[in-house]
């Protein structure tokens, strides 16, 4: 369920503190060098992708501080109810302590004191990109204050739990201490700042005249563009350009009040990929000493701008980072370069590019007022963490006297515990490194949800009781202070979506209450409710789900709204079958349309990503009952069945799960029914996300420690996270080195999980995926450990006999074509079938397969493994069983889905028959093609059995049955290994051989048993 905060106990009795004025309140806060420290998110509750943004962040500067009476000291208006009753105190009452705890002497009158606490931090990143709790200090004096030797603690029995090191708080300035447990005692200020602004600006656009369509045999994929040109428009947007100057400006870079600014209105053309502004550096700059970019300015709200560099004349190999707009000119955006730019060489940066990839009818406006690169330094980090459910903090000087204290209880994620200019503590909008924003509230309005029935499926009217002052909206619109006030008791008898918030004077608004009441029988499948603003999602002109006004005529309708990379906040609830009024969970997250060519389908695929700013960083729920080990998710997808939407329900689930038990990663899934704002939208395929967070869920790895490479529509291996440098270096080495020798083979086998690669390749080859390997191929490793590269199986819509599959030749030639997969190769020579074109660079899509097959041991293992898999995972019996199982899961819901979307039931039935026919006949086709390609001799059957507790491995592949008959080839020796289970011992083979690993020749050995005891 969505978390609702209760009982925010504001139980400290505070002294009223009148703080000094810290500068002219009208003073501009636009510092050309930007803020000093901290990665701050916008005070609006909009989500952020790759980095964060702030509308007010100026530590260490001379900007206005907390307003007061203008003095540099801290005069006190004493509270007669103070338990401490210490003159000059600004502290809150320490919590009751045990009799053994000695409360430090309270001294007070410190120029440095607590000004804000954020135990649930959702909008401030530390130097490592994490978001621990934090406490803010303010120095109200006219001189810096040295805190060396001072202490911070949350436990009076340990008053010097954490001690400040080299920390000086500048005059009239704020300072953050992160409560992370990392124990960084020093305050390292930013350094090595480089002004990246320049008056030399131009624009570039990439557009394709045919809307992204590729003709068969041209080597492209359905999601990419067919050509299109790069158009540069030096000095500003020209007539017909997709990058125009700001209104009233004659150039993209212009002088405003004596300072250079960058401004543009950008739009992606029909069928295009991007439009961007290119800002040259003053010289070819080195960024070797910097680890952060700081960009201040306006970006259209919820639109994304991708920042990248040109190194020399070309775009860098770094994938860049997204800035998500807030619609505020004073917003500050941060990009971390230390961990996120491993493919950036940094020593020859000639320009910065600001690109929009936002498709649709809307344009994206930017106005950059300052842009620097720097070494960000870091704030101090305490050696302890703060309890998000509440606690206390104490500030103690070197002599052991208490200077300040603050108590706090559980704080809503959207708020902090903040002190205003009059010394009053309360809930407020988080404002790290800045003045308290707006009013502070002593408490949050509480709503007894027990009186409001849960979301769900109902057949009779329900009654909900709301507290006085509750304002609600229907249909998915978010409530505001202007929304209608509802009656205390509301009766609901038809499908209704309610979004409500309780308001009361002097109190922080309640958490949002979201309910969806669907008046119909619960479906037999699990259901997902998606609640969101209806105009943002479904407005004919601007709705994210809709085509809009800027779409190309041809599929995939590039330029349509659904090609936008915008995200929308949504509330998602799930209902398991048989539990119509018991939501399994309810979470806020960001919604994004996903997919490539399939976006043009009426039913859209989408992804939901959890963000801490909405309350929860991870969904802790077993989404997939067949895989109870998967319990924590950053994100999940709901697919429309890809390019087969409206054709079948099984192809991709069947194709990706073929490797179950083989160690190849794939997206687990289940079928669900989706409702948008209470309206039925049919069957979707709930799947894991195939990004870096998959490895956190599956293996517990840090998602920031994953090198994840994707071969995408551009046809190159790009790092979606981490770095591609080592992988590309390996491919470069393979261009000039064969793997015939064991030494060279070992060099690659030390970097690549060869068994994993064989299993992956053979799955793709069996299902005959023609949208691969020039597209839809992913490989990954743990970066810090430099583990071996493994592969990820996904997006197999083009397999299992789909009508638009253009790959009709020999699949072994297809994956060994030196020029890639745009045409058919015809094998190697000398025992490997036919002659292949030679000379020139080998395609990065096929070079690994080509080189590995040069090694005799690998080639034999590859052939033998395929033989086993044709009798195991790829056998007709197993595949048909899987097809029937998948189809039976959706059977009862198919008719409604087909009627709602206008699918042809007869056509879908024929498509299912095609899938079954392929699953039964593909084994023979693979054998024919393999025999032709490798020039193999006649097959020979061999029965392999295990007796006792153990199993047999065939060239490294473990059999999953105790007895299996496999058809091998007489001229390809088979390596067998007997592997005992724990507690068991291998005693020998049935023919008297005692070596655990042995080679046998098919035809000479027809049956053998491994014996264990």
List the model feature ranges, each with a label:
Residues 18-21:
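C-terminal motif of bacterial Sec signal peptides marking the signal peptidase cleavage site
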Residues 23-33, 42-53, 57, 62-63, ...:
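Intrinsically disordered, low-complexity linkers and terminal tails enriched in Ser/Thr/Pro/Gly
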Residues 66-67, 205-243, 466, 547-549, ...:
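Disordered, low-complexity segments in secreted/periplasmic proteins that are enriched in proline
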Residues 168-172, 177, 402, 410-569, ...:
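Short, compositionally stereotyped local motifs that mark structural "simplifiers"
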Residues 189-220, 231, 235-375, 552-554:
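Beta-rich carbohydrate-recognition modules and glycan-binding surfaces
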Residues 432-440, 526-528, 535-552, 559-562, ...:
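Middle-to-C-terminal accessory/interaction subdomains
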Residues 558-715:
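Conserved ATP-binding subdomain of kinase catalytic cores across diverse folds
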């Amino acid at each position: 369920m969505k978390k609702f905060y209760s009982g925010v106990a504001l139980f400290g009795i505070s002294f009223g503190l009148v703080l000094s004025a810290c500068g002219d309140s009208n003073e501009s806060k636009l510092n050309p060098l930007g803020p000093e420290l901290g990665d701050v998110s916008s005070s609006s509750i909009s989500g952020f992708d790759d980095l964060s943004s702030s509308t007010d962040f100026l530590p260490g500067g001379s900007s206005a501080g907390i307003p007061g009476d203008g003095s540099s000291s801290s005069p006190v208006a004493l509270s007669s109810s103070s338990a401490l009753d210490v003159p000059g105190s600004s502290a809150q009452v320490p919590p009751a302590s045990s009799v053994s705890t000695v409360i430090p002497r309270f001294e007070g009158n410190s120029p440095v004191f607590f000004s804000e606490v954020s135990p649930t931090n959702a909008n401030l990143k530390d130097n490592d990109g994490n978001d621990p709790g934090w406490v803010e200090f303010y120095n109200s004096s006219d001189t810096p204050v040295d805190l060396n030797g001072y202490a911070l603690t949350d436990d009076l029995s340990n008053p010097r739990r954490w001690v400040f090191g080299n920390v000086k708080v500048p005059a009239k300035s704020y300072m953050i201490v992160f409560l992370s447990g990392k124990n960084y005692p020093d305050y390292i200020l930013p350094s090595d700042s480089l002004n990246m602004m320049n008056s030399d600006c131009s624009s570039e656009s990439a557009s394709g005249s045919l809307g992204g369509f590729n003709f068969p045999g041209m080597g492209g994929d359905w999601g990419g563009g067919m050509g299109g040109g790069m158009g540069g428009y030096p000095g500003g947007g020209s007539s017909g350009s997709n990058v125009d100057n700001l209104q009233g400006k004659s150039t993209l870079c212009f002088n405003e009040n004596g300072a250079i600014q960058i401004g543009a209105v950008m739009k992606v053309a029909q069928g295009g990929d991007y439009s961007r502004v290119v800002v040259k550096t003053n010289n070819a700059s080195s960024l070797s000493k910097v680890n952060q970019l700081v960009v201040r300015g306006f970006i259209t709200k919820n639109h994304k701008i991708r920042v990248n560099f040109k190194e020399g004349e070309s775009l860098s190999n770094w994938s860049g980072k997204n800035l998500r707009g807030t619609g505020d000119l004073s917003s500050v955006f941060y990009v971390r370069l230390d961990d996120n730019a491993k493919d950036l060489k940094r020593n020859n940066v000639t320009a910065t590019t600001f690109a929009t990839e936002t498709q649709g009818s809307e344009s994206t406006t930017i106005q950059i007022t300052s842009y620097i690169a720097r070494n960000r330094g870091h704030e101090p980090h305490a050696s302890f963490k703060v309890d998000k459910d509440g606690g206390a903090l104490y500030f103690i000087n070197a002599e052991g006297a208490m200077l300040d204290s603050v108590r706090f209880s559980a704080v809503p994620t959207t708020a902090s515990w903040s002190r205003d200019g009059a010394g009053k503590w309360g809930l407020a909008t988080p404002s790290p490194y800045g003045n308290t924003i707006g009013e502070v509230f002593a408490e949050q309005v509480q709503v007894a949800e027990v009186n409001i029935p849960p979301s769900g499926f109902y057949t009779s009217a329900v009654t909900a009781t709301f507290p006085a002052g509750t304002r609600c909206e229907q249909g998915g619109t978010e409530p505001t202070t202007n929304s209608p006030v509802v009656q205390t008791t509301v009766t609901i008898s038809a499908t209704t979506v309610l979004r409500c918030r309780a308001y009361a004077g002097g109190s922080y608004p309640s958490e949002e209450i979201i309910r969806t009441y669907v008046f119909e029988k619960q479906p037999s499948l699990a259901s997902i409710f998606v609640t969101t603003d209806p105009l943002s999602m479904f407005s004919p002109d601007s709705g994210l789900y809709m085509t809009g006004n800027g779409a190309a005529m041809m599929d995939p309708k590039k330029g349509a709204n659904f090609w936008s990379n915008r995200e929308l906040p949504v509330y998602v609830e799930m209902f398991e079958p048989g539990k119509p009024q018991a939501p399994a969970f309810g979470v806020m997250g960001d919604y994004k349309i996903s997919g490539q060519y399939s976006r043009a389908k009426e039913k859209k695929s989408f992804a939901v990503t959890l963000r801490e700013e909405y309350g929860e960083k991870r969904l802790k729920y077993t989404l997939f009952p067949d895989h109870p080990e998967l319990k924590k998710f950053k994100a999940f997808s709901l697919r429309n069945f890809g390019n087969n939407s409206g054709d079948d329900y099984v192809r991709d689930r069947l194709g990706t799960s073929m490797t179950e038990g083989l160690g190849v990663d794939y997206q687990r899934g289940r079928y669900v029914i989706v409702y948008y704002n209470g309206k039925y939208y049919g069957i979707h395929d709930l799947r894991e996300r195939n990004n870096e967070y998959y490895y956190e869920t599956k293996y517990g790895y840090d998602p920031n420690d994953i090198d994840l490479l994707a071969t995408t529509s551009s046809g190159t291996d790009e790092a979606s996270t981490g770095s591609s440098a080592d992988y590309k270096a390996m491919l470069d080495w393979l261009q000039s080195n064969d793997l015939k020798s064991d030494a060279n083979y070992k060099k690659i086998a030390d970097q690549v999980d060869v068994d994993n690669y064989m299993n992956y390749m053979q799955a793709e080859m069996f299902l005959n995926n023609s949208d691969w390997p020039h597209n839809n191929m992913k490989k990954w490793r743990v970066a810090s450990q430099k583990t071996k590269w493994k592969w990820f199986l996904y997006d197999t819509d083009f397999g299992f006999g789909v009508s638009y599959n253009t790959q009709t030749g020999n699949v072994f030639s297809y994956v060994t074509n030196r020029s890639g997969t745009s045409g058919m190769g015809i094998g190697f020579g000398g025992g490997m079938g036919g002659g292949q074109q030679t000379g020139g660079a080998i395609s990065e899509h096929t070079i690994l397969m080509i080189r590995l097959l040069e090694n005799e041991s690998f080639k034999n293992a590859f052939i033998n493994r395929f033989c086993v898999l044709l009798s195991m995972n790829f056998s007709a019996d197993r595949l048909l069983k899987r097809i029937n199982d998948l189809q039976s899961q959706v059977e009862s819901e198919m008719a409604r889905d087909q009627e709602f979307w206008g699918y042809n039931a007869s056509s879908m039935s024929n498509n299912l028959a095609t899938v079954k026919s392929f699953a039964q006949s593909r084994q023979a086709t693979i054998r024919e093609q393999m025999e032709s390609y490798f020039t193999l001799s006649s097959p020979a059957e061999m029965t392999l059995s295990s007796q006792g507790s153990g199993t047999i491995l065939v060239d490294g592949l473990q059999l999953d049955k105790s007895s299996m008959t496999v058809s091998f080839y007489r001229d390809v020796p088979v390596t067998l290994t007997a592997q005992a289970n724990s507690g068991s011992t291998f005693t020998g083979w049935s023919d008297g051989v005692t070596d655990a690993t042995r080679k046998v020749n098919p035809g000479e050995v027809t049956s053998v048993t491994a014996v264990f005891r």
